[in-house]
């Protein structure tokens, strides 16, 4: 169900779109279920019809390109389509049962005229279960060739556009085209989705803001995303002008997948540095708390399709070509490279490394050949042309220097190579060399291992001898961590690469066999089907609680996100609390200080005149017992709040308590051994000196290490380490080590805001003035103790009448409190309303403006 606030934002938001001529959104219209046609041009606030009754499990796979091959029939002039068996989107079906229905959304690799689009759409849906997204030629070029290939692709591969030859500078029009294209994809998904049952799986960096459009329309959509390219470090990514929009787009998913932990770590670091989000690992699953939703992170490299490779290996043409290659290079060691003509594949570095190999090991001349198959470039530009020129020049230089009339150490194959021929080279090669300087995954090593294993029907590959293989792979490619038996190299260190190739070539047969068996076992058990099934299982787990929470849609445009909270969690309003406040005679009010009455700040810490005025108004009512419960020291709080004579203060989390300004400070804690301070201070000081932007606060009862002004990642990392360090050092001391919001605190055992609130309520009961209403407001972890303690205390049988309790957190976030207020301004508005109510016989109409938000 779509929340009303979300639906309202659909009309209010202003998307960053370009005005491209497009096919009307309702043409072609697509049947999702017999007899039901969805029409996204209708009222966006209307309910979505659920068709789950007779539908089977369905996955919607959204990618830039459909897994189809297209051509026009020469005789009829009609378009003909067939499955692209090499497409990952098609191969991932192997991970699911035959009962699972797949629907594909994406573009075709050909341009379809506008007057043919409806006919083609119906044909694709009926025959292939595919939904085509038709982009105009101009939009396609700006979206794919422009933003994707000339801005995102270089940046994600660590190339900054500092010079014209290093990627294009950011172009706002290309970004608008990217957003426009993603919007068209979302329109097509909306036409066919059954949001209550379908799972949507988005593939790769072309569609990183698509989740925002879908989440905006369907708050509880089941949405996964997998990034097939690297994700750069935060220092690189933060240079992107639209960095926040893309991060928020990805965070509108339920599950985000990466090939390696490095890529995931960089993404998490960006979320921490740019959006202030923390993550944690529970039972092996990494999760980001994002406005009440947990966005899970999946780390699993994609695999190959074993059946596809083995079927090609079994072909007679493959066997014949394998024998031909073996005969051609008889008596020589064959090193194989298969790469796209791309500046990131490191082909020229590979050739230079081979040149160093021949320079260093002269005896290998005439005995080693590198066959480099060059796949066509996926994009064009000066950098691709330069890479191609350098590759040919380097190969020619090596062949002229080390070759003979009947021997070429470098064999360049720069043409469209049939699949059977590539497979034959894989099967015949003694060593596979992958030298990319940056690559998302790269499945060449996997294919090489499978082809070296062979099949029983391929007599050219399979005989009675053990299977062997050797791999030299770059440490900068996604498959490297999975290949523990490979020789990993830094592609920039050509001497080390040359040495690695030499080591691979002279490796013993036994060692080659052991390494091969280890690789083949992993690859055969972690194929593309395993990858897809594992991802979908995690996505189902991530979406399990979708309907147990209520949703708010907040934010405009690409800043949209969904706030997901408990059904009982609601905003506390003046209108709701004033009637209870007025009918009760004794009230206890507990207020946090930082982040509740005043904003969190390391600079301005004293309260404003308005805060003091509101507190004075509350304290002047003799029926109110008002306490500030804070972690700050008693001296600071006394000075700041001195005008409020009847205000109670529980300083240092309740270690010191004073009921009124003229009363003496009291503590219920016996003086503890303070030797622990001499143990803690040197540790904290050491971390402070090592971590720029941190400080130590010396309290009478505690020591606090603050890292609010430190680098977010480094400060958080240091806080975790110091927590472990101090817990170990203080294991036998009567103190506890607590981590709070940007702090690590060491304090005596049994000191907490919850216990302080309990003490106040207990003393009110003993005085014969049990509270009839209790309100507590706070914003951080320490206040959760107060909420929990008060909620349990008020059920005490000593209280003859159970008081009304209003536990309220500041900020819409998961909490033990039942209510929330948005910020400090909201808190003051509420307190001002209560103060005015104390001095008036009737509720003031000017303070009944805030009401419960409508939640659907």
From Swiss-Prot:
The keyword Glycosyltransferase applies. GO terms for molecular function: glycosyltransferase activity. Keywords: Glycosyltransferase, Phosphoprotein, Transferase. One of its GO terms (biological process) is trehalose biosynthetic process. Expressed in leaves, roots, stems and flowers. The modification Phosphothreonine is found at residue 32. The modification Phosphoserine is found at residue 5. Its EC number is 2.4.1.15. Transmembrane segments: none annotated. It catalyses: D-glucose 6-phosphate + UDP-alpha-D-glucose = alpha,alpha-trehalose 6-phosphate + UDP + H(+). Residues 57-541 are annotated as: Glycosyltransferase. In the N-terminal section; belongs to the glycosyltransferase 20 family. This is Probable alpha,alpha-trehalose-phosphate synthase [UDP-forming] 8. It comes from Arabidopsis thaliana (Mouse-ear cress).
């Amino acid at each position: 169900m779509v929340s009303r606030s979300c639906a309202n934002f659909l009309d209010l938001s202003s998307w960053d779109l370009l005005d491209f001529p497009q096919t009307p959104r309702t043409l072609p219209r697509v049947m999702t279920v017999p007899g039901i046609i969805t029409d996204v041009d209708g009222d966006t606030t209307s309910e979505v019809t659920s068709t789950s009754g007779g539908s089977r499990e369905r996955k919607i796979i959204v990618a830039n390109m459909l897994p189809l091959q297209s051509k026009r029939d020469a005789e009829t002039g009609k378009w003909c389509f067939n499955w692209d068996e090499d497409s990952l989107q098609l191969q991932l079906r192997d991970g699911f049962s035959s009962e699972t229905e797949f629907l594909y959304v994406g573009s075709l690799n050909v341009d379809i005229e506008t007057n043919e689009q409806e006919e083609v759409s119906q044909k694709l849906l009926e025959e292939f279960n595919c939904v085509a997204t038709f982009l105009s030629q101009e939009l396609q070029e700006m979206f794919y060739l422009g933003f994707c290939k000339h801005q995102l692709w270089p940046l994600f591969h660590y190339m900054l556009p500092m010079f014209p030859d290093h990627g294009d500078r950011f172009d706002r029009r290309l970004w608008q085209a990217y957003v426009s294209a993603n919007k068209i994809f979302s329109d097509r998904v909306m036409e066919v989705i059954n949001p209550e049952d379908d799972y949507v799986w988005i593939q790769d960096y072309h569609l990183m803001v698509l989740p925002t459009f879908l989440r905006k329309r369907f708050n509880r959509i089941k949405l996964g995303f997998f990034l097939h390219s690297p994700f750069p470090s935060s220092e690189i990514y933060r240079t992107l002008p639209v960095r926040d929009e893309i991060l928020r787009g990805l965070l509108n998913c339920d599950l985000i997948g990466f090939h390696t932990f490095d890529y995931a770590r960089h993404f998490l670091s960006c979320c921490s540095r740019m959006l202030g989000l923390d993550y944690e690992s529970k039972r092996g699953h990494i999760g980001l708390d994002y406005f009440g939703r947990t966005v899970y992170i999946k780390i699993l490299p994609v695999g190959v399709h074993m059946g596809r490779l083995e079927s090609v290996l079994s072909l007679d043409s493959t066997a014949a070509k394998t024998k031909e290659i073996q005969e051609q290079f008889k008596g020589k060691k064959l090193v194989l490279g298969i790469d796209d003509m791309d500046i990131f594949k490191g082909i020229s570095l590979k050739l230079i490394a081979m040149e160093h190999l021949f320079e260093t090991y002269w005896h290998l001349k005439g005995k080693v050949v590198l066959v480099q198959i060059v796949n066509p470039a996926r994009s064009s530009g000066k950098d691709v042309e330069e890479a191609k020129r350098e590759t040919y020049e380097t190969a020619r230089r090596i062949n002229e220097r080390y070759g003979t009339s009947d021997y070429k150490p470098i064999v360049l194959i720069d043409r469209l190579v049939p699949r059977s021929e590539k497979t034959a080279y894989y099967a015949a090669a003694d060593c596979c060399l992958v030298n990319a300087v940056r690559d998302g995954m790269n499945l060449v090593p996997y294919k090489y291992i499978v082809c070296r294993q062979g099949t029983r029907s391929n007599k050219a590959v399979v005989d009675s001898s053990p299977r062997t293989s050797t791999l030299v792979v770059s440490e900068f490619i996604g498959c490297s961590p999975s290949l523990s038996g490979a020789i990993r190299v830094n592609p920039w260190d050509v001497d080390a690469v040359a040495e690695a190739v030499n080591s691979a070539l002279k490796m013993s047969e036994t060692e080659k066999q052991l390494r091969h068996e280890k690789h083949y076992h992993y690859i055969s058990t972690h194929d593309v089907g395993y990858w897809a099934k594992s991802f979908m299982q995690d996505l189902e787990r991530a979406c399990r609680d979708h309907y147990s929470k209520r949703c708010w849609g907040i934010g405009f445009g690409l800043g949209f996100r969904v706030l997901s909270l408990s059904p009982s969690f609601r905003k506390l309003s003046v209108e709701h609390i004033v009637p209870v406040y007025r009918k009760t005679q004794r009230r206890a009010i507990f207020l946090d200080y930082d982040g509740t009455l005043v904003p969190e700040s390391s600079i301005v810490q004293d309260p404003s005149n308005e805060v003091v005025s509101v507190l004075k108004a509350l304290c002047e009512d003799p029926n109110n017992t008002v306490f500030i419960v804070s972690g700050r020291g008693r001296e600071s709080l006394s000075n700041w709040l001195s005008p409020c004579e009847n205000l109670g203060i529980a300083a240092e989390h309740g270690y010191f308590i004073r009921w009124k300004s003229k009363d003496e400070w009291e503590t219920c804690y016996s003086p503890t051994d303070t030797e622990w301070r001499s143990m803690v201070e040197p540790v904290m000081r050491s971390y402070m000196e090592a971590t720029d932007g941190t400080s130590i606060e010396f309290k009478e009862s505690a020591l606090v290490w603050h890292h609010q002004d430190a680098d977010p990642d480094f400060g958080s990392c240091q806080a975790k380490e110091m927590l472990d360090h101090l817990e170990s050092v203080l294991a036998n001391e009567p103190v506890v080590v607590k981590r709070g919001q940007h702090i690590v605190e060491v304090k005596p055992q049994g000191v907490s805001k919850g216990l302080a609130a309990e003490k106040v309520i207990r003393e009110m009961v003993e005085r014969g003035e049990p509270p009839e209403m209790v309100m507590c407001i706070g914003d951080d972890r320490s206040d959760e103790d107060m909420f929990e303690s008060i909620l349990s205390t008020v059920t005490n049988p000593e209280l003859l009448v159970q008081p009304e309790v209003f536990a309220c957190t500041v900020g819409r976030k998961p909490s033990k409190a039942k209510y929330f207020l948005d910020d400090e301004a909201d808190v003051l508005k509420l307190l001002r309303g209560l103060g005015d109510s104390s001095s008036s016989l009737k509720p003031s109409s000017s303070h009944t403006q805030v009401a419960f938000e409508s939640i659907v």
